[in-house]
Amino acid sequence: MAGEDHQWQGSILYNMLMSAKQRHAAPEAPEARLGDQCWGCSCGDEPGVGREGLLGGRNVALLYRCCFCGKDHPRQGSILYSMLTSAKQTYAAPKAPEARLGPCWGCSCGSDPGVGREGLPGGRPVALLYRCCFCGEDHPRQGSILYSLLTSAKQTHVAPAAPEARPGGAWWDRSYFAQRPGGKEGLPGRRAMALLYRCCFCGEDQPQQGSTLYSMPTSTNQTPAAPEERPGAPWWDTSCGALRPVALKNPQVVCEAASAGLLKTLRFVKYLPCFQVLPLDQQLVLVRNCWAPLLMLELAQDHLQFETVEVSEPSMLQKILTTRRRETGGTEPLPVPTLQPHLAPPAEARKVPSASQVQAIKCFLSKCWSLNISTKEYAYLKGTVLFNPDVPGLQCVKYIQGLQWGTQQILSEHIRMTHRGHHDRFIELNSALFLLRFINANVIAELFFRPIIGTVSMDDMMLEMLCTKL
């Protein structure tokens, strides 16, 4: 039999049977090869090792025939084994990515470190990785762009920390009376909630209390808070709320006193020797431009006091009905007037003075009364106002300029002789003249003369008074 076995050792059947028996036997471990690396698999990287832990301490090496080199290699070094083990790694928990020095331009992974989700059983952190669409690398969810968008959208419903106080910015990025950036108090647990809004000017997030839209009324049912007490605004400031229309409380008495003051003013101007030498057209130019401040000085000298009452302007319907009646020739009845019908012109032709404009007149009168100006000082001040070389349309500018300079010199000499502190007195008188710049001539005409002269122009009345003997 031994010879027969030796005879069949080289046959194909013998080789198949012997290879089948090797599965149940414990073959010896393959010897380590010195070189001869296999290029078709990874057997050259890892040495062939056996499976330990069987009964008797025998090692079993599962060999596979390499499809490239034709040699037997252990299972750990085959290509199929490497593919299967690498595929299983996708289901395992990956390690947290190491911190990179260079920031990723496609997401915010460079800003926030890669952290995992805490709070799972056992306290094990789990990092959910997402493939970045820009850099092609895996980043934790906290560092992705989508996560940043979602978390920023959720901040409007949660209570974020109050923003830090920033240095005062430019005036256009917030309202003037902006409150301090803070949260909404009164929530359960005394938690502060700051509602942030993106500023359309500076592009930064600012609290709602500091924005310009917050200052506007947000609801019709909202009760306005008591305004803070601010320093008193000057009478020429139009933001103080004194734009309501007013009228004289006693128009007949005040208008007669104002007309008498205008008559005395024109008589004083007309009979000045230096004024009489001027041509009539030059006289008319000076009077038309200086009658209002001259009248204010005369009313201050006469100590004219008056009171005003607030009136309501005619409605749009009343203006339409009045205009329609004038066009149709008076066939329709007149609407109910708000002022004296025999003194006031039509509603669309009137410009009712406002409270701030009347307050400017009273301020000038009070200033003059506080200085106790004498009769001569009033006369010199009137001469200074009358001979104004800056009046447009004036031809004899040098002559008028010389008259004004001479009047100032006479006033200064008079003050030096009658007052010790003549420099201060001269400055105070000129400061009173400076207040005349804030008084409009049309306001004086509407307030004191419109109820009497009606639609007659003040320029025509000045011409008539200059040509007639007063």
Swiss-Prot record:
A cellular component annotation (GO) from this entry: ribosome
Cellular location(s): Nucleus; Cytoplasm
Transmembrane parts of this sequence: none
NR LBD domain sequence ranges: 205-469
Short sequence motif named LXXLL motif 1, residue ranges: 13-17
Chain span(s) of sequence motif AF-2 motif: 461-466
Motif (LXXLL motif 3): 146-150
GO molecular function: DNA hairpin binding; nuclear receptor binding; protein domain specific binding; protein homodimerization activity; RNA binding; transcription corepressor activity
Annotated SMART domains: HOLI
Domain of life (superkingdom): Eukaryota
GO BP terms in the entry: adrenal gland development; gonad development; male gonad development; negative regulation of DNA-templated transcription; negative regulation of intracellular steroid hormone receptor signaling pathway; negative regulation of steroid biosynthetic process; negative regulation of transcription by RNA polymerase II; protein localization
Extent of the Sequence repeats: 1-67, 68-133, 134-200, 201-253
Function per UniProt: Nuclear receptor that lacks a DNA-binding domain and acts as a corepressor that inhibits the transcriptional activity of other nuclear receptors through heterodimeric interactions. Component of a cascade required for the development of the hypothalamic-pituitary-adrenal-gonadal axis. May also have a role in the development of the embryo and in the maintenance of embryonic stem cell pluripotency.
Domain notes: Homodimerization involved an interaction between amino and carboxy termini involving LXXLL motifs and steroid binding domain (AF-2 motif). Heterodimerizes with NR5A1 and NROB2 through its N-terminal LXXLL motifs.
UniProt family annotation: Belongs to the nuclear hormone receptor family. NR0 subfamily.
Protein name: Nuclear receptor subfamily 0 group B member 1
Lineage: Eukaryota, Metazoa, Chordata, Craniata, Vertebrata
